[in-house]
């Protein structure tokens, strides 16, 4: 085969098929196919991210604490614990708080597994989020330089209507929940329970440095890995 023929064949192999989307003169790709391809690309990206997070033993909570997010976090905690018991798990969170019940499922799981859980506040850890942040392994609780923490007592979550007996039950439950939160934070931060109860009376905000002083976290993070 002559050099000219070889060059011609190599050139043809390198060229895309006529009509391939994205080539000059090709017909416009239908909008529906574009959307399907974009959705497929997104799914593939999420799979890659999930594999990366699994390989690095990282869990993320971004948003409110509810049954759905708690199920996701707890499932991953148990999966990583089963995979390599006793090896560190990194828990990144940015949350305004949410359901106390759902949050306590995460909290208890963190405390019951053998693997130490490092907590990293990426932006905001408020309400239930602050309790989860404080629950990390002592010495391994971190916050981003511009992260914020807010603690406060639990609320009834709106206007409560009903007979007085029901309202008394709600009030008693709030008091029990408040006391539980104060006890947990006192244990995790080293603050007195009286100080926590006092700070619970209003929204108590802390920047990164103040969160370290308070004992919610141990260090302001300066690099991820």
Where do the protein language model's features map onto the residues?
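N-terminal organellar transit peptides
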Residues: 1-128, 135-225
């Amino acid at each position: 085969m002559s050099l000219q023929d070889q060059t011609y064949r190599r050139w043809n192999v390198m060229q895309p098929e006529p009509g391939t989307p994205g080539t000059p003169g090709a017909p416009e790709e239908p909008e529906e196919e574009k959307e399907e391809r974009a959705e497929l690309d997104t799914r593939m990206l999420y799979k890659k991210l999930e594999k990366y997070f699994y390989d690095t033993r990282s869990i993320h909570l971004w948003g409110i604490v509810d049954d759905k997010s708690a199920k996701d976090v707890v499932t991953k905690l148990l999966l990583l614990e089963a995979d390599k018991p006793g090896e560190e798990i990194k828990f990144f969170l940015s949350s305004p708080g949410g359901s106390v019940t759902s949050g306590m499922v995460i909290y208890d799981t963190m405390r019951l597994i053998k693997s130490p859980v490092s907590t990293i506040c990426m932006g905001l850890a408020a309400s239930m989020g602050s309790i989860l942040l404080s629950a990390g392994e002592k010495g391994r609780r971190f916050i981003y330089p511009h992260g914020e923490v807010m603690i406060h007592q639990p609320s009834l979550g709106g206007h409560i209507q009903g007979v007085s007996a029901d309202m008394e039950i709600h009030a008693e439950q709030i008091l029990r929940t408040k006391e539980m939160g104060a006890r947990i934070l006192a244990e995790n931060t080293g603050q007195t329970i009286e100080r926590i109860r006092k700070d619970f009376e209003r929204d108590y905000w802390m920047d990164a440095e103040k969160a370290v002083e308070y004992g919610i976290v141990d260090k302001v993070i300066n690099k991820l890995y």
